[in-house]
């Protein structure tokens, strides 16, 4: 018997944050342990806007939205931990950017036939 597939965490995070605009999401680490029915994915969220203040506000809004994920049963997210940030980290060309890193734990669910 195989464990059910785990949800795509990057996709879950992106779907929640995409309407904020100026958001990029990528996983930089992941891990699962026996019996492989849950996984924790480390996600980095880069937040861009036209000014430092707008970027700051958007980053903290993104943080709040991610912390609400475990309370949405449809999300399959069991836990969100802030790993670092939001922190000011402008692009090399000086463009405004805040970076937020979170650990998102998900659980696989078998579909009932």
What are these regions (language model features)?
Residues 1-23, 27-113:
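Charged, amphipathic alpha-helical segments and their flanking helix caps
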């Amino acid at each position: 018997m195989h464990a059910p597939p785990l949800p795509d965490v990057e996709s879950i995070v992106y779907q929640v944050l995409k309407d904020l605009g100026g958001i990029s999401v990528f996983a930089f680490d992941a891990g699962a342990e026996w019996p492989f029915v849950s996984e924790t994915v480390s996600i980095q969220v880069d937040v861009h806007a036209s000014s430092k203040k707008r970027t700051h506000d958007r980053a903290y809004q993104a943080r709040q939205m991610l912390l609400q994920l475990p309370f949405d049963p449809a999300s399959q997210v069991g836990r969100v931990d802030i790993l670092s940030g939001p922190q000011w980290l402008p692009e090399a060309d000086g463009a405004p950017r805040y970076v937020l890193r979170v650990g998102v734990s998900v659980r696989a669910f078998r579909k009932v036939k």
